[in-house]
A protein has these predicted regions:
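Bacterial Sec-dependent N-terminal signal peptides
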Residues: 1-26
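A short, surface-exposed beta-strand/turn
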Residues: 106, 342-357
Length: 357
């Protein structure tokens, strides 16, 4: 356990250094509607229920930075009922392999599929789930993104009612043939995803912030077994990261960039509409200021006290000019703005937590 905590600290430092060194690009999150099913979904990796046939596939996954087309295709479908959030992933892979069998081990050392969920969209207290082709699970509860200090990561936290199953279209761990890929079927219990005790944790006709990621490694065969490929110096080659909704940087832990999954109360096969609320677009701009503050702090070891020191004193949303307020205090700052769309005050704290009043 101590070694795993040290590893997570190393990951945190690495992400903190690299994500702000990368060139930022504007990210427009994707949306998808998850329709309700009244059919019993058997989690067996086969997805042969009528509801799955009616559900729509997502777009093809894209490289995490948004620039490159992945070598192999990945797609997801989604459903929900009164108890579970269902996810179906098809993962094209000519060589299906895996060797990690211990729960809560570092699953992304194998090729894997990952689910990130932030039910209330405040970028804090979110969930990460990683599963490999052996159906080995790593689930975490993350109190704050790695970019923040004092961010306990609850690696011992587990989904209590999670169901998952894998089917392989080909063979597993056989380097002598070519496979088509693997299919992963997941049922995440809503009871494990409470945003607060006083809230109904079943998201009827509302959205959650969600993203999906696929880690894919180049491989080599050693003594007839797959392993991650190494360079001439014996170092592992970098992995590929392919995602549903692009992050713009090699960092899944910027939850404000995740996609929007709308849980429609209409049954699968019916039609519903969802558009991203205008207040969410204001949030995007506030997070741009937040990231600018991060960059400013790295350079001057203090936060900016005026918006003009960052990216300007106003923002434009839907042809409306908004004037955010930057308030400094002993431990950092608050960014706030009055939404002309909802008449709510939108607040972003120095640790990235979003509040709406």
């Amino acid at each position: 356990m101590i070694l795993k905590k040290v590893f997570l600290l190393v990951v945190f430092i690495s992400i903190l250094i690299t994500s702000y060194a990368q060139t930022k690009k504007d990210v427009v999150p994707l949306t998808q509607i998850a329709y309700k099913t009244t059919e019993t979904i058997i989690i067996d990796g086969k997805a042969d229920e009528t509801s799955w046939e009616k559900a729509s596939w997502s777009n093809d996954f894209i490289d995490i930075e948004g620039f490159k087309t992945p070598n192999h295709q990945t797609n997801v479908k989604m459903l929900w009922d009164e108890n579970y959030y269902y996810i179906l992933a098809t993962i094209e892979e000519p060589h299906v392999w895996g060797d990690i069998k211990e729960r809560d081990a570092v699953i992304f050392y194998n090729n894997d599929f990952e689910v990130f969920i932030d039910p209330d969209g405040d970028t804090h207290n979110y969930y990460e789930l990683e599963i490999n082709a052996l159906n080995t699970i790593w689930d975490l509860f993350i109190t704050k993104p790695y970019r923040e200090l004092n961010n306990p990561i609850l690696n011992d936290w587990n989904y209590t009612g999670l169901k998952s199953a894998v089917t392989v279209n080909g063979t597993l761990n056989n380097p002598n043939d070519i496979d088509k890929g693997w299919t992963l079927e997941i049922a995440i219990p809503f009871k494990d995803l409470r945003t607060a005790y006083e809230q109904d944790n079943i998201p009827r006709d509302t959205f959650w912030r969600v993203n999906f990621s696929r880690v894919n490694w180049q491989y080599q065969i050693t003594d007839g077994k797959y392993e991650r490929k190494k360079d001439a110096e014996g170092q592992f080659l970098e992995e590929y990261n392919w995602v549903w909704s692009t992050q713009g940087v090699i960092n899944m832990h910027e939850p404000e960039k995740w996609g929007y999954v709308y849980f429609s109360s209409k049954n699968v096969g019916e039609k519903d509409n969802f558009s991203i609320p205008k207040d969410e677009k204001i949030k995007w701009k506030l997070y741009e200021l937040y990231r600018a503050q991060k960059t400013y702090f790295e350079k001057y070891n203090t936060y900016a006290t005026t918006l003009d020191s960052l990216t300007g004193s106003s923002i434009i949303i839907e042809n409306k000019k908004l004037n955010p307020i930057l308030e400094s205090h002993k431990t950092g700052y608050n960014l706030s703005v009055l939404s002309p769309f909802s008449n709510k005050i939108l607040i972003l704290k120095e640790d990235g937590k979003f509040i709406s009043k």
